[in-house]
Design a protein with these regions (language model features):
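NTP/phosphate- and nucleic-acid-binding module
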Residues: 1-35, 39-41, 47-587
Length: 587
């Protein structure tokens, strides 16, 4: 998906189109007032105060019609410089522009004119409105002025603009495809997820079928970790403020945390991450160098107060479950343990068919002694160790100077999802600081107490985001082992006792063999029930008629296919068990 903000050509064009939209709105609603209309990654938007009027699809159509008229007229776009006092006089009846102007430094201010419309703007802009003719208004929403919930609501209208009609058409097709792949839409159709503002924004809930998928992901990654010597724990999702002051998160991360809760004279917070709890688990026991590495893992509930505008289903919420682990190692073990983490990441990606990713090795800026822990030898050794592992494994990566955490270098594995922008799915970070903050030690070979190094790592990232990623990549066509309902039994008739008895016998047979089967014997036509099962992306549809009941066989069709295959019950079960055991990817 194109990034309008980073493409200079598109950025200028879309900025101008935002002004065309504002001019059209002003023609239709003379009382309208405007806050800001920037270019963003997805195109442009303008925040508009329409008084008691509300934007709907009919209003959008009317605005687009007026915009086309303005573009056809081909109005010249002029840049002017005015003094701050002149600008204040020019916009004296517009509280929003006055607010913007009052926060500008003294000196000349730029405004842009096009026909009967003038707007405060830094620019740049194209020179004629006719260049903005290939546009589309794509969505609208209500937002608080300045993003502050204590302020009134404004109408935000989004749009896109391209130099050619062909580029616009191609982009709109991409948007339509993205809409079909959106995990929120898929989650609703497949009865996986729900949300309700009464529960809270950014707090989606997993329905029974969605929780089945979530549990399969949990079982999958915990099984892999157990085989590699991980020890799983469970820790509370709250902690004292003092815990986070000790870790340093209170000073550096407080704005992303929920407010403290005062209980019996103590301040508690919902945890945003699990490192402090895992540090305390390590500190609970004395350790020798012979005990290390110690790998503590947890599927942990975390809470972060994300801005409401960034929330997106289970991809980005205020509550999520992280596939977290902390590896306590000696300096000599950094390379081997990091190598094992990288292996685990890419073995996992192979199981899910993930191939479109980018590895980023984030390093310190050696000139910045303020941001980064000041130990050149430590940094050089750590960065060289991570480079060596990636090079030895033949993994392509880019280096980003100055992007390391203050406590050590890290590897991020970023994916390009089917919907939206690139984000980090997996990470492994070296930490030389946190163990010291908690006075963690081990007794080394020489009998002296030493401070361990910690590797923070998340393979699936958060299970929630990983599930969103897989749903969008597969369009909900999950591999059989992940599918919430693996086989749907559909008797051709629901009033045939012999057929219904066989259907229930088969249902029990599959359940007894750990197949997630269901049976639909409603008094609906077979075609209707088949279509409904297709919408829910059920991998196997079992069509049972009199012949199957008499022969004790199974006639099945795969999701999205029309042809039917008939086999014995045992053959069908063996086929499913093999597909589940080998974790075959979606067909």
């Amino acid at each position: 998906m194109v990034n309008f903000k980073e493409d200079e050509r598109l950025s200028t064009l879309n900025h101008s189109c935002a002004h065309v939209m504002a001019q059209a709105v002003k023609h239709l609603y003379p009382h309208a007032k405007f806050w800001v209309g920037p270019v963003v990654k997805e195109g442009f938007y303008y925040d508009i105060d329409l008084g008691n009027d509300v934007v709907n699809d009919e209003v959008i159509a009317a605005i687009e019609k007026e915009m086309k008229k303005i573009c056809k007229e081909g109005k010249k776009i002029y840049r002017r410089e005015v003094s701050k006092a002149e600008a204040m006089e020019m916009f004296k009846d517009d509280m929003y522009k006055l607010d913007l102007i009052s926060n500008l430094e003294d000196g000349n201010i730029t405004v842009y004119d096009q026909g009967d419309f003038t707007d405060l703007c830094r620019g740049p802009h194209v020179d004629n409105t006719k260049l903005c003719k290939n546009f589309k208004l794509v969505k609208h929403s209500g937002v608080y002025w300045k993003g502050d919930a204590s302020n009134h609501v404004m109408q935000r209208i989004y749009g896109v603009c391209f130099p050619t009609a062909e580029e616009l058409e191609a982009h709109l097709k991409e948007l339509e495809e993205a809409k079909e792949r959106d995990h929120r839409k898929i989650g609703k159709e497949m009865e996986l997820l729900m949300s309700d503002d009464l529960v809270g924004r950014g707090l989606p809930m997993f329905l029974p079928k969605g929780y089945t998928v979530w549990q399969e992901l949990e079982n999958y990654i915990k099984d892999k970790e157990r085989r590699l010597g991980y020890l799983h724990v469970m820790t509370p999702c709250v902690g004292t403020v003092n815990l986070y002051k000790t870790s340093g998160h209170w000073d550096h991360y407080k704005e992303n945390m929920f407010p403290p809760m005062e209980v019996e004279g103590e301040s508690f917070v919902l945890r945003p991450m699990n490192c402090p709890h895992h540090m305390m688990i390590y500190a609970n026991t004395q350790h020798s160098y012979k005990d290390l590495p110690i790998r503590i893992g947890e599927i942990a509930h975390d809470f972060r107060f994300e801005a409401s505008g960034t929330l997106k289903g289970i991809e980005r919420g205020r509550h999520f479950c992280q596939n977290d682990a902390h590896l306590f190692v000696t300096p000599e073990q950094i390379e081997s343990e990091f190598s094992k983490v990288v292996d685990l990441i890419f073995n996992t990606y192979k199981d899910f068919g993930i191939t479109d990713y980018r590895c980023v090795l984030s390093l310190r800026d050696p000139e910045d002694k303020v941001k980064y822990h000041d130990d050149d030898e430590m940094w050089n050794n750590a960065e060289d160790a991570l480079r060596k592992v990636l090079n030895d494994l033949g993994i392509e990566y880019t280096e980003e100077i100055g992007e390391a955490a203050f406590y050590g270098p890290k590897l991020d594995v970023n994916v390009k999802p089917a919907v939206g922008n690139e984000y980090t799915l997996s990470t492994c970070q070296l930490d030389f600081c946190l163990p010291a903050k908690f006075n963690l030690t081990y007794v080394d070979k020489d009998g002296q107490k030493k401070t361990p190094v910690v590797l923070h790592r998340a393979i699936l990232g958060s299970l929630d985001r990983f599930m969103a990623y897989i749903l969008e990549e597969t369009k909900g066509n999950l591999p059989l082992w992940l599918a919430p309902v693996q086989a749907m039994i559909l008797p051709v008739k629901n009033d045939d006792e012999e057929l219904n008895a066989y259907a229930h016998d088969l249902f029990g047979y599959l359940l007894d063999n750990n197949i997630r089967a269901d049976i639909d014997e409603r008094a609906e036509k077979l075609g209707y029930r088949v279509r409904e099962a297709q919408v829910k992306k059920i991998p196997y549809l079992i069509i049972l008629g009199k012949q199957e009941a008499q022969d004790g066989t199974v006639s099945y069709r795969l999701h999205g296919q029309q042809n039917t295959t008939t086999v014995s019950k045992d053959e069908f079960l063996a086929m499913l068990k093999d597909e589940i055991a080998t974790k075959k990817l979606s067909k």
